[in-house]
């Protein structure tokens, strides 16, 4: 693994240059097959390789279908400042506030991002979970210790601009010292 990880990071740097400290990999995406591998050991090796290549590396991890497991989070070995979990489908299926997911709320106190997935496979359609977006972002902003931002994770983004506008409008306020409140979508 070490040989290929080093080669991967070197090739990425050669192609893209020094453009980021964020790296995404999902060794057990959508369940995967762990075989006889320990998810904690795999997680530790993945992060070790990233940090060997880039001391400021941040591993971007998707929260989706059982990932990240408690073992994967435990494998970070206390280096959670080098991880960022994307709560991939938070507007419909939140995981940040589920204490049974990943071994504890907020992914065992790992920095995370509230994400709106909304679109699967680039399918066209005007649909979405507006009420969930409005209440979910406010709930996360007001009740989370580890929330670091909001984002979008669609499989196709050239549709339904209303939802994207709404998501990013939910965190906009003129006075950052005030408690975030829900947007009245009837007035919006």
Feature-to-residue mapping (PLM):
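Catalytic-core regions of glycoside hydrolase
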Residues: 1-188
């Amino acid at each position: 693994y070490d040989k290929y990880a080093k080669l991967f990071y070197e090739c990425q740097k050669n192609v893209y240059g020094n453009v980021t400290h964020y790296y995404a990999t999902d060794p057990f995406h959508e369940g995967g097959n762990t075989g006889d591998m320990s998810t904690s050991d795999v997680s530790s090796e993945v992060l070790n390789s990233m940090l060997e290549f880039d001391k400021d590396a941040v591993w971007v991890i998707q929260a989706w279908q059982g990932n990240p497991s408690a073992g994967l989070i435990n494998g970070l070995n206390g280096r959670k400042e080098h991880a960022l979990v994307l709560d991939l489908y938070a507007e419909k299926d939140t995981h940040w506030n589920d204490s049974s997911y990943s071994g504890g709320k907020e992914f065992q106190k790992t920095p995370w991002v509230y994400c709106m997935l909304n679109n699967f496979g680039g399918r066209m359609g005007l649909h979405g979970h507006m009420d969930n977006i409005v209440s979910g972002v406010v709930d996360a902003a007001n009740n989370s210790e580890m929330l670091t931002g909001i984002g979008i994770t669609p499989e196709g983004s050239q549709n339904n601009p209303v939802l994207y506008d709404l998501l990013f409008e939910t965190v906009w306020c003129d006075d950052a010292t005030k408690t975030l409140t829900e947007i009245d979508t009837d007035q919006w």
